[in-house]
Amino acid sequence: MGKVPPGVGPKYPQVVVLMGATGDLSRRKLLPGLFQLSRAGFIPGCRIIGVSRDDLDTDGFRTMARETLDRFSIRGIGETDWAAFAEILDYVPLAAGAGTLLRSVEKAEQALGGDSRRLHYLSVPPNAALSAVQLLREAELVERSRIVMEKPFGTDLASAVSLNAKLHEIFSENQIFRIDHFLGKEPAQNILAFRFGNGLFEPIWNRNFIDHVQIDVPETLGLDRRAGFYEGTGAFRDMVVTHLFLSLIHI
């Protein structure tokens, strides 16, 4: 593992509680991304606790994570890098309850030593978001924490407003990050720089010179393990009003 440049990585040691750890987004994006951060030395002093409905133990979760990396990682998996990553993985089944989750987080914090922080990443469907937040409150894991809410945030305006109000009963606004992982893709990140940092295109980037905007999503991905999610959310909410509309806003 390479040396971390000064100023790179979190200021404090982090315990990452990954809710929905065995789900599709976690398998395809989050676990491979966390592995690459670990491999590059960007998350020193980090422990990852997976939480989901699957009845696994830590060894089972590590096995699942390795299979996931072998399938979805864009780079090869070195055994030394994998061993270091596997060492920071832990797992708590949802059925084990808030007390078990708290003990697992406290154990991770003791292993890290010093002043640590908690990052709760909710990779769960909208109908499970509130119960996940309530679990964190029951486990007394709100202090010294940040919470990341993946899209879609609710299923319509009313449910989003309701979820936001209930979320504020537990977390303060400066603890909450509502995100769309699609905007983390490099082409999406580069749109603003391409538009505003380019003296050739910026002056003519307006309705007088642009005839229309077309956004293509040439994906071949099927439902796979997402049938339950799509049954309640649907492709329009999952893709159009989140990924595509947010990309359009950048344009």
Which residue stretches match the model-derived regions?
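Glycine-rich phosphate-binding loop and adjoining beta1-alpha1-beta2 segment
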Residues: 39-90
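Substrate-binding/catalytic subdomain of NAD(P)-dependent oxidoreductase enzymes
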Residues: 228-247
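A contiguous active-site-proximal alpha/beta segment in oxidoreductase catalytic domains
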Residues: 148, 153-220
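Conserved small/polar residues in nucleotide/adenosyl-binding loops
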Residues: 249-251
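Beta-loop-alpha module in the N-terminal Rossmann-like domain of NAD(P)-dependent dehydrogenases
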Residues: 99-101, 106, 111-146, 153-157, ...
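N-terminal low-complexity, Ser/Thr- and acidic-residue-enriched intrinsically disordered segments
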Residues: 1-60
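Short acidic-hydrophobic, aromatic-tinged amphipathic segments that line or gate anion-handling sites
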Residues: 90-97
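Catalytic cores of eukaryotic secretory-pathway lumenal/extracellular enzymes that build
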Residues: 3, 55-57, 65-75, 103, ...
